[in-house]
Amino acid sequence: MVEGIGDEFQRSTKHSRERLLGGRLDWANKPETYKEYPSARKVPLPRNFPSSTLSFLEAVKKRKSVRSFFPEPLSLGDLAFLLWASTGIQRAEQGYEFRTVPSAGALYPIETYVIVNNVGGLEKGVYHYNILAYSLEELKNGDFGEEMAHAALEQKICAAAPVVLVWTAVFNRSKWKYAQRAYRYVYLDAGHIAQNLALSATSIGLGSCQIGAFFDEEVNQILGVDGVEESVLYLSVVGHPR
């Protein structure tokens, strides 16, 4: 088999006894942990989370990829719960805010965007989850479902589901400490978040499907990110399973 860029990536980002990737930490230039759109309209998120009738074991047993949804809106409360459970702030200790998922070095390079197709109390559009302010920031108004489906290799569930969650990485948050090995960690971080999302959705009777097939730059354009400093990694649709 002919080697390619993936093989080189795996080889070049290995630790060895002779070489640990990373370097001296430049605390004066540590990247910001949180992203915010100061001029965007903020939608406060409710904290009265839905109750789950499933145990953790039952949620694990029932989780599956769902690709067909009823045309029912998602409630804002359900969306708020999913956002918090997937990557919200769980506790504060020693000056750090820790989240519901692990992250290499507690650097949290992943940002969450929401393509709203059908959520009670929200206009259709593109939103950013402001974790620190526990709110949604409205970035664009309009119906982006078909555009997302087109960008996701014509996967129509991106238009049919009430929401599409889009996870991006702000790479320098991790590269600041881990240099090139950070690229391994950001993908792991996205996976942690996606699994939390999948189990949380199952626990309240919703379904999800994680999506890794998409045209990166088309999704980046929908979000308004540059694809260099910040770029899409992963998607998930969520809705009421048929």
What are these regions (language model features)?
Residues G205:
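Structured binding elements
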Residues R173-K177:
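Short acidic/His/Gly/Ser-rich catalytic and metal-binding motifs that mark active-site loops
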Residues R181-D189:
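Short pre-catalytic strand/loop immediately N-terminal to key active-site residues, enriched for Gly-Thr
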Residues S208-Q210:
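Active-site cores enriched in adjacent His and Asp/Glu residues with nearby glycine-rich loops
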Residues A194:
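C-terminal substrate/ligand-recognition segments
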Residues M1-W167, F171-N172, A213-R242:
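N-terminal accessory segments that position/regulate proteins before the catalytic core
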